[in-house]
Amino acid sequence: MENGRNWRNRELRQHVKVIDGTVSPTLLLKNATYLNVHTKQWLEANIWIYKDRIIYVGEKLPNQSQETEVYDCEGRFVVPGYIEPHAHPFQLANPEITAMHAAKTGTTTLVNDNLTWYLLTNKKKAFSIIDQFNKLPISMFWWSRYDSQTTLQEENHFINTNDVLDWINHPSVVQGGELTDWPSLLAGDDRLLYWIQETKRNGKPIEGHLPGASLRTLTKMKLLGISADHEAMTGKDVMNRLQLGYMVGLRYSPIRPDLPAILEELLESGLTTFDQLTFTMDGPTPYFMKDGVINTCIQIAIDKGIPLEDAYRMGSFHAAKHLRMDEELGSIAPGRIAHINILQEKENPNPIGVLAKGEWIVKETKEIDIPSIIDWSKYEINEMNIDWNLTEDDLQFSVPVGMDVVNDVIIKPYTIDSDVSFEELNEEKGEQFILLIDRKGKWRVNTIIRGFAPKLGALISSYSASGDIIIIGNSKKDIFIAWNRLKEIKGGIILVNNGEILTEIPLTLGGSLPNEPMEQMIKYDKQLKDTLQKYGFAFYDPVYSLLFLSAFHLPFFRITQKGLLDVKNRDILFPATMR
């Protein structure tokens, strides 16, 4: 299979020979009760699979040879592999461990953000990596970003017309977006509009990012080419989008676990047609997805009263159809990739068996060991080597405006009226030093942050929206300890207090991604959250809080490569200092 979705001519001829009886299937699912997503019926059938493709679904049994594995599905229920149409697989994880973890609970297709590739490597190497991902049993597709969702000093170096068009044309890229910089589109950015139109000409949909958008804005964005949006926070938000013709992703994420309430509101509103709805976890951190991905969303939908057949379609077929991939994914029918989940009960979407491209991932609840295939060093994504030093001069804080953390996503500016010239800040005011510093040591941006984790001596993270280094703390002494440790472990997240290292998470792939199993990352993630909460962190997810410190698609004030940013007006109020 080429590009994760197309078979060669000789393979197609071989598939037909299975029907003719001259070639035996590699796997037979016998006596299956399966969900036909096209008719919304549970039907009895034998399912023939040849390698990675479903060949036949019906009453007949094939000619069998010793090479045919027979699995009896009597008393079990079979549904299509689940699809996550909006994945951010880089949140304290890497795409391979995210995919393999998701597959264990039935999510066998991920459509992924490509933004981190822009920051980690060049286009040629990125394309080589995603071609390698096609060799996984999980189907891995990508979307093409139009903006960096932060303010970069060399934005055009990372995201430009040549690169965007090359991404759009790549066969593993199945949609454009997500469009976080939609205000620029409305303000007349014709380059952005050109990219969107080229994506549409390629037959690929566009994912928006439209939290809180009015009907007027939603209408304008539809006219400019946006196909779908996943930022609805209420049932009314969903209905507004549905009525305008949007595909709507219902979100259950660490900072927006809205799905249960949204489903209740939709059912109360009388909605009975769910064809334009999908599910997404929108980039869960490891601990949040410890029990799975789309299986969790389907379970919530079933528990809230969504009809079974619709709940499973929302977790599979709807996404495939929206992405123009329903000939390959999202159903149990001839010609589809053999992504199949075997359930003990219809009402329980947590599978006891998972097939991905016809390969067992889970069999009779036992996880099958699938070896890693991504050699990160081959693409020069290695440890983060820092060959420069943080100095006392870097820890000078004289800007009069600080960052007031209101919740997981909102940061407001405030006037600093404290004396912040000391080696330590008093935790009573909730203030800490904050520094965003270039990973190569060329520039820095300094101010004060209030309401993050005011009791903590130091946090340092090479994980950030721009790939630079974030430092937060109330003790300069602890900051230097954290800095030295970051250099020693060559990238990661480190917490220090009173000279003691409390927690550290190694991120050995470019300082941004881990190269450890998901089980370990789940432990790290929980440890990070628990430790920060002890030191005053009052919000849900610290990983997202770190990521969003620089994100210009959220209100109202951000720390970016260019300086402190007024998000609404896109003005740099205090520019970065060159070192």
UniProtKB/Swiss-Prot annotation:
Its EC number is 3.5.4.2. Keywords: Hydrolase. It is an enzyme of class 3 (hydrolase). One of its GO terms (molecular function) is adenine deaminase activity. One of its GO terms (biological process) is adenine catabolic process. Coiled coil: none annotated. It holds the Pfam family Amidohydro_1. It catalyses: adenine + H2O + H(+) = hypoxanthine + NH4(+). InterPro entries: Adenine_deam, Adenine_deam_C, Amidohydro-rel, Metal-dep_hydrolase_composite, Metal_Hydrolase. CDD domains: AdeC. Belongs to the metallo-dependent hydrolases superfamily. Adenine deaminase family. This is Putative adenine deaminase OB0751. It comes from Oceanobacillus iheyensis (strain DSM 14371 / CIP 107618 / JCM 11309 / KCTC 3954 / HTE831).
